[in-house]
Amino acid sequence: MAPRFDFSDLWAKETRRGTPVVVKMENPNYSIVEVEEPDSAFQPMEKSRGKNAKQVTWVLLLKAHKAVGCLTWVATVFWSLLGSVKRRLSFTHPLGSERLGRDGWLFSAIKLFLVASLAILAFELVAYYRGWHYFKNPNLHIPTSKLEIQSLLHLFYVGWLSLRADYIAPPIKALSKFCIVLFLVQSVDRLILCLGCLWIKFKKIKPRIDEEHFRNDDFEGSGSEYPMVLVQIPMCNEREVYEQSISAVCQLDWPKDRLLVQVLDDSDDESIQELIRDEVTKWSQKGVNIIYRHRLVRTGYKAGNLKSAMSCDYVEAYEFVAIFDADFQPNSDFLKLTVPHFKEKPELGLVQARWAFVNKDENLLTRLQNINLCFHFEVEQQVNGVFLNFFGFNGTAGVWRIKALEESGGWLERTTVEDMDIAVRAHLHGWKFIYLNDVKVLCEVPESYEAYKKQQHRWHSGPMQLFRLCLRSILTSKIAMWKKANLILLFFLLRKLILPFYSFTLFCVILPITMFVPEAELPIWVICYVPIFMSLLNILPAPKSFPFIVPYLLFENTMSVTKFNAMVSGLFQLGSSYEWIVTKKAGRSSESDLLALTDKESEKMPNQILRGVSDSELLEISQVEEQKKQPVSVKKTNKIFHKELALAFLLLTAAVRSLLASQGVHFYFLLFQGLTFLLVGLDLIGEQMS
């Protein structure tokens, strides 16, 4: 049979293609018609219904498959997290817990507070299940007549309500209002600093050199136009980083006859002393003017080391001194970017460069530190340098005019923050400071929580020591009154004392108390909106860290315990305020340094030829080399931090109490803050210490 030709089939095929069809009519009264889509009337309805039903079934199956996969992934992540926690805790040594020493007063107070909170929570739970829901109403109705008293336990509970409302709530309200005022004042100060930084960026304000100094074509000459520069590298048992810091300093682009490097080694380990001495000898043989100094009597920590080095007779021939800690790696043009700022500025005493971190992305702890330090350098140091010509010397990556050091009294051993001490005394003597935000020096941040905690304790106890010692000198100095007010009110009180005081008191003491005393409940904007806004301001200098805003906020509240304890120790001269512990380094290098080192070793090995050596001696040498290459296995340990753990249980207890009172925001804040304290207390953040 011949195939049947149907115009309807042809029309259906053309309409399925979706090709636009334009029909033109000769009569101008007709308009142009454009057909875009096929007519739905030609589509078979029964088949589409069957097809849609199958599609729905397949969609449901796909969604179920995705849900199962998601649950499997969550379970895998959860079990892997538990496994890593178990492995970390398995390394906890019986003696690896935190030593409280004379600072155990804070831990004892937290324990007492925790026991009282657990007792009150148990009492509240009994009352809750008995149906005494008085605490759900902020305006509590306390039974007064004997007819309303149901039992002896009910009588005790009513007595607790009366005691709470009449005697406990009023002082807590007063303290919370005081802390909220301090919180708002500090927030305004932080906001003003950010506005000042934006103004500097908008106006492109920065210290500039008037002309090009020390041209490269004059470098091969006598170098008489180059000032004499002394470079000091203080170190103490810095096995991991001594080599890269000495190497970087010895490659500074400066005439050799105008530069002297002092390696100030305070190590008490003879093997480390020998390593550093060999490194100095190696660079000395290459023509670098470098000296190794080791003190037999190690007093005064870093300040004593620097003071001893400045007492050498040959220092009188030098005009400037650059200081680098053992983990700092300056670029070769560092001196050419900093020293020219001193020319024709006799009042300038210090040029400070910015820190850059080679290990900022190593773990969560280093990322959170990077947020804080970026704000410190980008905002605080830059704004104070531009508008006040004064800021706290960071202790390293800076160049001092030696005359300014001498007129200010030199390095003193009275505190553990000798850098801030010399900066304040130089400011009182009228010297000005310059901060260079675009000159960066590579360094490390602590990768373990233990090292970071010790560093922060020293950084926050020292300023309080210094404040006690310098207050009279500030009041009797000849500087302007507004400079005295800035030093006392802003530099010391607001940013060094008030900040750790209110952050710990408000979020770690008052907030959990108010869960058991609902008459003094904190408003939501205090615990949620304002802290998030301030965290956003802190993250602005490091925009890539924006995903870590919530961990940053929680971790900063966790660190308030250490900072508050350090502040009190320094203010009242407790034992730990005089403790100096060298921050543990990992010895990280930049990627370019690692690549250069790899190339150097690969070129060195094939060209090594040993002559005049027998086969047996070659075998012994190879065995010794293999032993040197084998890494020394050092067991890493976890530490238990008692104060953080006690506060974790306290906040979680308060979270349970807030759950009974149906306080949503307070519950979630206390829950996540308590879990953060728990993770930190178990040393589950950062690397483990070896």
Swiss-Prot record:
This is Probable xyloglucan glycosyltransferase 8. Homodimer. GO terms for molecular function: glycosyltransferase activity; protein homodimerization activity. Mainly expressed in flowers and seeds, and, at very low levels, in seedlings, roots, leaves and stems. One of its GO terms (cellular component) is Golgi apparatus. It is a multi-pass membrane protein. The chain crosses the membrane at residues 106-126, 180-200, 497-517, 522-542, 640-660, 665-685. The lineage of its organism: Eukaryota, Viridiplantae, Streptophyta, Embryophyta, Tracheophyta. Its EC number is 2.4.1.-. The gene is CSLC8. The modification Phosphoserine is found at S614.
